[in-house]
Amino acid sequence: MHSGVNGCCPLRLPAAAAVHGRRIPPLLPPRGAWPGCIAAPALHRKPGRGGGGALSSCRRASHHEKLQVAALPSKATLEFEHGVSLRSAYIVPEDVQAAGFQIDADELASIVESRDTKKLTVHGQLNGIADKLGTSLTNGIVTDKDLLNQRQDIYGVNKFAETEIRSFWEFVWEALEDTTLIILSACAIFSLVVGITTEGWPQGAHDGVGIVASILLVVSVTGTSNYQQSLQFRDLDKEKRKILVQVTRNGLRQRVLIDDLLPGDAVHLAVGDQVPADGLFISGFSVLVDESSLTGESEPVFVNEDNPYLLSGTKVLDGSCKMLVTAVGMRTQWGKLMAVLTDGGDDETPLQTRLNGVANTIGKIGLFFAVLTFIVLSQGIIGQKYLDGLLLSWSGDDVLEILDHFAVAVTIVVVAVPEGLPLAVTLSLAFAMKKMMNDKALVRQLAACETMGSATVICSDKTGTLTTNRMTVVKACICGNTIQVNNPQTPNMSSNFPEVAVETLLESIFNNTSGEVVTNQDGKYQILGTPTETALLEFALLLDGDCKEKQLGSKIVKVEPFNSTKKRMSTILELPGGGYRAHCKGASEIVLAACDKFIDERGCIVPLDDKTSSKLNDIIKAFSSEALRTLCLAYREMEEGFSTQEQIPLQGYTCIGIVGIKDPVRPGVRQSVATCRSAGISVRMITGDNIDTAKAIARECGILTKDGIAIEGAEFREKSAEELHDLIPKMQVLARSSPLDKHTLVKHLRTAFNEVVAVTGDGTNDAPALREADIGLAMGIAGTEVAKESADVVILDDNFSTIVTVAKWGRSVYVNIQKFVQFQLTVNVVALLVNFTSACFTGDAPLTAVQLLWVNMIMDTLGALALATEPPNNNLMKKAPVGRKGKFITNVMWRNIVGQSLYQFAVMWYLQTQGKHLFGLEGYHADIVLNTIIFNTFVFCQVFNEISSREMEDINVLRGMAGNSIFLGVLTGTIFFQFILVQFLGDFANTTPLTQQQWLISILFGFLGMPIAAAIKLIAVEPHEKADTRRTP
């Protein structure tokens, strides 16, 4: 079509049935019409080649099959003979035939796995496979329950073999393999043998049985804790498999879980999808697949009728298609690969690695003091024997005494080595991951929990994250006439525009779309597609509610799907009357710039002059300033001789109209942004929308401030490194951005400004930025599978407020582990000092091996359980983030550790030296009573220090404690077992029952640690080492 320069050239109307027609021509050769003919490529050649064309070849093939005549009249017959011999070699198993199918699972899987074209030909190409699977390429499988069960029994389920669940006893055995516990076990056995030999049963067995019982208690608690964590992580792994896939079943398009896919399903794939099973290409356009995860080849592969093989686990980089599933689960190449890979769930997080270094250092210090303690304790008896000349004469009592000293030394190592550090990290991460799942965040990488707590910048998408992603067209400018959509005063909107413009607009919307209008089981229209496509299709139905009329006619022959680089989608239609028409839609400025004509208010095609162009740009700006997303729709009549092999033109279009789409800001986003700001986290908005829309939304969200800068991607890309260095600290909005712009910004923030960056992404092209960021956050609803695979955390509800919740939980994990480390180091220091100084000055250790093992369990397992599972509070988001270079053990922690250790050691030393006088203890029984009081006081010091450790800076440590059932349970359990240990298990724990007064004084000394801790917190220290002064807003 050509428009006149002067006057009105009327727009050619499309055929009535051509508006919505989306009939795609067959992309594979038709099946042979002659009985027994196989649709091999060789049978569809033009007449004159190979001795008489396809029909004669089919006839010869048929006669050959019936009469077994060994004649070779053509190449086609040769190929056919080979095919018949292959087919005759395949025998359908009886159980498969009985279930109503004509091909077994292994034969079917081998076709795609080996890309066996000959075998595919033998089975009748795509249509033959579909027939043998009892499915329809158009309508998919029938979902009758019995039929689905039969199909599942024959072909299997789409699940991979899971690693065998480790039993509880395996975790117990793993805990028993600890070197220090093995040494203690040997000591216990030796103690039992010597004790029973010298003192008889049961008196001689008390020490040994006590140590064994303590070891078993420690091992069982540790094993139970680790077993529970493994179950939690397995549940989280199952959540990762909850992927919805679009299929056609019973002729209806619907979503099913990836695990429910079966061979015979017709699956719809689009850009960013991960291929959910092995299968064959049915139809589609421009399908480009990344097979590197399977083949290692970095070059993407085109999938079409000539190369119809789609492999599970590969990713769709471009285009869209429909696929016939042929193999699922462990019969796919991906499933077989998964079977030979080891479970990677045991990788340590960065914080665990750092803490292992701390644990090793403390362990070496503990070993040094343990050796010294053993030497000091043993030198008395050994020295005396040397003086008496009895070095070679040892009684059972002498051996037991040395053994006791050795057990104390080994137990000091057990106490000193903080095995609880990695346990605390794992516990805290497991607890946080489970709670975050309830808060709509799926953690894919454990390290993300820690890192998110240090985040200083969040780079967020707009659509669906800051906004609701529930889009509707609220304004439209067609033929220069702007209307309010859904206005009660204009019920028949199409009457506002020329008929020819409405028909062209409908043709554009219904054909140039990745969405689809289908009829659901209730007979009502249902729209499937992205929120943008849904909004446009709803608008089209409002203009002309009868979609059925527009289902036939034009054929889609070429599609260029939308991507964030081109910011447009284009389609070529083959018209019923001949010729081709291109339709294009996308970012308003970009598509309008590609137009040189437009449809005026009379329905005429007129040149797009500067005045009209300026007017349309003003409309775009007006829509955008109202926070509306704008799309421009245009078309172009293709010249005679156009070939579908050519590229879709980028210029020469006729503007049909502009629509304004409302995507409301999510409730609570403004408050969440304010929370981030108070927490020292700056929020940047990165969007593909134009700058006016972006600024309006950013102001509404509270992201764009008076001093902030909003900039477009094109301008951002032109900046030099020096200019970016000055710009980025003030930049709060990046509009019309490409994925490369996002990647560049994230890289600069991390390297030049040393920020810890969290970035959101939903598209395939966002994968580089998600990997570049410290924390990649993918959208669970709008996000593609490629984006989710590249992310550390999946935001299941696509809500910005959930991102803030993840940041809060990340800080909680980090702070909880700091609390535990502070608590544990205090116990370590005091236990070492008490036993070492007592050994040096009195020749005895007041804390025995059994007692130290009990303290170790309080400190390691129970302490980790209590402090590492503290839920986050709002105060966490009122402090500055730790950042990339923040110290883990801060000055605040050292202040608390030193202050509390000095108090506890002073109490222990006072009781050691003045305890007998204080309690009036005399006689042979005085030592064991005093040692029991020291042990009891020491334990209660840890109980109350555990409460004080709930807050490292705040004095009010009781806030929220009543609501923390785990913490209260640990405290109650510790006190209960301490009472049992002291009052009733004295023979095993080297204790004796205490009086009420002695209990009260022990508890009082422990309680006094709380006001002492509060007073220590009043001592001002620098909370963190000074961070970078060059912070972004």
UniProtKB/Swiss-Prot annotation:
Keyword Phosphoprotein: yes
Positions in the Cytoplasmic compartment: 1-180, 225-268, 383-405, 844-846, 949-965, 1020-1033
GO CC annotations on file: intracellular membrane-bounded organelle; plasma membrane
Keywords from the UniProt entry: ATP-binding, Calcium, Calcium transport, Calmodulin-binding, Ion transport, Magnesium, Membrane, Metal-binding, Nucleotide-binding, Phosphoprotein, Translocase, Transmembrane, Transmembrane helix, Transport
Family matches, as Pfam families: Cation_ATPase, Cation_ATPase_C, Cation_ATPase_N, E1-E2_ATPase, Hydrolase
Active site: 461
Swiss-Prot/TrEMBL domain comment: The N-terminus contains an autoinhibitory calmodulin-binding domain, which binds calmodulin in a calcium-dependent fashion.
Function: This magnesium-dependent enzyme catalyzes the hydrolysis of ATP coupled with the translocation of calcium from the cytosol out of the cell, into the endoplasmic reticulum, or into organelles.
Protein name, UniProt field: Calcium-transporting ATPase 3, plasma membrane-type
Organism classification: Eukaryota, Viridiplantae, Streptophyta, Embryophyta, Tracheophyta
